[in-house]
């Protein structure tokens, strides 16, 4: 196997990883502590003094975590017994064995950035589960729900578009169907801009109708493998036996507006018969501020269904029906909230890898998935995507991502360098997007 480059880390002063660890992560921790403070009366109403004491305990644990981060203390093992605790602690030991630091301890600014961020969110979860009876509390729930409520006009526009499309879908010729598929893929791409971890938990609602902006946004798609996706799925549709299935898996990113765009794409896949089943993978615990959990998934569908708007409500009712019929299936797996890069999946989570191998196509949404697919390493811009996947090839896959981290592969020679020279922050603001495919052509 080819030598893989070093991991991105906070050692590179001034890098996006460094600034994330120095500024954004402490800001997110401060917001989490503030959220717990603001819910103090709710905890008292539900649980009496016990709830208030639990809130104090959680805040104390989180304040300690913030201090560890800001003073670059060594990582400490997880202590609360949870389904993934042993795997986490083994990984922390493994990472420590790789370090050349004088005391051989993993620290915030010297460890791989991917590990640092995942560890921080896992420690937030530990602080909550160590504080019963408020151990059920999702510290990011409010901001995820605000993102959804703040995007109502855009959601109504998308639901209306989808319902009108479904009503005429049988009259569309192949080129028209392809155009609509590409349109909804692009909406799912730009929906990925709504990332609350990038904004430090500040509002990132979608206030404009993305449908009207697609032409203007096209120049910002750096890699466009949508044709490969169409070719793959339309071929599956043409050659499918009557009783056989075409499975598309979507590894989700953000809840709120982005999740709506993903569900609209998933609805279109069924309505157009490009797929017969859509499987969704979310996070088992609150993660990276806005990532989708099973609670977020069910809550959002319920909200859409109970909307006062005719077409929005119809979408929600349809989506609920798909779930009842088994055409949409939501899966939980702890692997998605581990710090491992995806090339480790066959060893760490062979059951999940075997499940992914059943897919005809896997869509990986967002930046964290891209970082884990490529190992979050200092790859050259022109390294082929297939190579950067480092042996992770369960099924044909495509990453749909707006760029918010200093990692990108598969570009034309000189393309990344040119962008860097003209626009130093081109790969960290969400301005540019990619559809990057790996699989048979």
From Swiss-Prot:
Reaction(s) catalysed by this chain's protein: beta-D-fructose 1-phosphate + H2O = D-fructose + phosphate; beta-D-fructose 6-phosphate = dihydroxyacetone + D-glyceraldehyde 3-phosphate; L-glutamyl-[protein] + S-adenosyl-L-methionine = [protein]-L-glutamate 5-O-methyl ester + S-adenosyl-L-homocysteine
Binding site for substrate: 253-254, 367-371, 404
N6-acetyllysine modification, residue list: 40
Modified residues (Phosphoserine): 102
Modified residues (N-acetylalanine): 2
Cofactor(s) it depends on: Mn(2+); Ni(2+)
One GO MF term attached to the UniProt entry: enzyme binding
Enzyme Commission numbers on file: 3.1.3.-, 2.1.1.-
Spans through the membrane: none
UniProt PTM: Automethylated.
Ligand binding (S-adenosyl-L-methionine): 258, 291
UniProt cross-references to Pfam families, sorted A to Z: ARMT1-like_dom
Residues noted as binding Mn(2+) in the record, renumbered to the chain: 253-254, 291
One example of a Gene Ontology biological process annotation: DNA damage response
Keywords: Acetylation, DNA damage, Hydrolase, Manganese, Metal-binding, Methylation, Methyltransferase, Nickel, Phosphoprotein, S-adenosyl-L-methionine, Transferase
Presence of keyword GTP-binding: no
InterPro entries membership: ARMT-1-like_metal-bd_sf, ARMT1, ARMT1-like_metal-bd
Keyword Hydrolase: yes
Taxonomy, superkingdom: Eukaryota
Ranges spanned by the short sequence motif Subfamily III RTxK motif, renumbered to the chain: 401-404
Notes concerning its domains: Subfamily III proteins have a conserved RTxK motif about 40-50 residues from the C-terminus; the threonine may be replaced by serine or cysteine.
Function: Metal-dependent phosphatase that shows phosphatase activity against several substrates, including fructose-1-phosphate and fructose-6-phosphate. Its preference for fructose-1-phosphate, a strong glycating agent that causes DNA damage rather than a canonical yeast metabolite, suggests a damage-control function in hexose phosphate metabolism. Has also been shown to have O-methyltransferase activity that methylates glutamate residues of target proteins to form gamma-glutamyl methyl ester residues. Possibly methylates PCNA, suggesting it is involved in the DNA damage response.
Protein family: Belongs to the damage-control phosphatase family. Sugar phosphate phosphatase III subfamily.
Record-given protein name: Damage-control phosphatase ARMT1
């Amino acid at each position: 196997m080819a030598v893989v480059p070093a991991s991105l880390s906070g050692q590179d002063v001034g890098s996006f990883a460094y600034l994330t660890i120095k500024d954004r992560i402490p800001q997110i921790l401060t917001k989490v502590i503030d959220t717990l403070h603001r819910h103090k009366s709710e905890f008292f109403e539900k649980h009496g003094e016990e709830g208030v004491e639990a809130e104090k305990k959680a805040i104390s644990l989180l304040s300690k975590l913030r201090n560890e981060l800001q003073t670059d203390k060594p990582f400490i093992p997880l202590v609360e017994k949870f389904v993934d605790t042993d795997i986490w602690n083994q990984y922390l030991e493994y990472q420590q064995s790789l370090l050349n630091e004088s005391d051989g301890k993993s620290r915030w600014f010297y460890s791989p950035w991917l590990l640092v961020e995942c560890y921080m969110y896992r420690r937030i979860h530990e602080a909550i589960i160590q504080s019963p009876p408020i151990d059920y509390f999702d510290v990011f729930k409010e901001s995820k729900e605000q993102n959804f409520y703040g995007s109502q006009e855009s959601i109504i526009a998308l639901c209306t578009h989808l319902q009108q499309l479904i009503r005429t879908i049988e009259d569309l010729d192949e080129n028209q169907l392809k155009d609509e598929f590409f349109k909804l893929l692009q909406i799912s791409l730009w929906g990925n801009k709504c990332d609350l971890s990038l904004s430090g938990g500040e509002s990132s609602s979608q206030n404009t109708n993305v449908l009207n902006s697609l032409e203007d946004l096209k120049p910002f798609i750096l890699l466009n493998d949508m044709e490969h996706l169409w070719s793959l799925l339309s071929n599956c549709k043409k050659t499918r036996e009557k009783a056989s299935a075409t499975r598309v898996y979507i590894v989700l990113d953000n809840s709120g507006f982005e999740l709506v765009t993903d569900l609209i794409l998933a609805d279109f896949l069924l309505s157009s018969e490009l797929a017969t089943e859509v499987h969704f993978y979310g996070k088992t615990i609150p993660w990276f501020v806005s990532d989708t959990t099973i609670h977020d998934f069910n809550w959002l569908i319920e909200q859409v269904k109970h909307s006062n708007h005719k077409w929005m409500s119809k979408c929600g009712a349809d989506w609920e029906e798909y779930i009842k019929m088994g055409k949409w299936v939501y899966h939980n797996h702890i692997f998605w909230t581990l710090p491992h890069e995806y090339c480790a999946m066959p060893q760490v989570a062979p059951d999940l890898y075997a499940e992914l191998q059943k897919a005809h196509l896997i869509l990986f949404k967002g930046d964290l998935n891209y970082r884990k697919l490529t190992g979050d390493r200092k790859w050259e811009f022109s390294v082929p995507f297939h190579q950067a996947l480092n042996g992770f090839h369960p099924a044909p896959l495509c990453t749909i991502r707006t760029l918010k981290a200093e990692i990108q592969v598969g570009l034309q020679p000189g393309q990344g360098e040119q962008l860097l020279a003209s626009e130093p922050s081109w790969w960290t603001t969400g301005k540019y997007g990619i559809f990057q495919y790996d699989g048979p052509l």
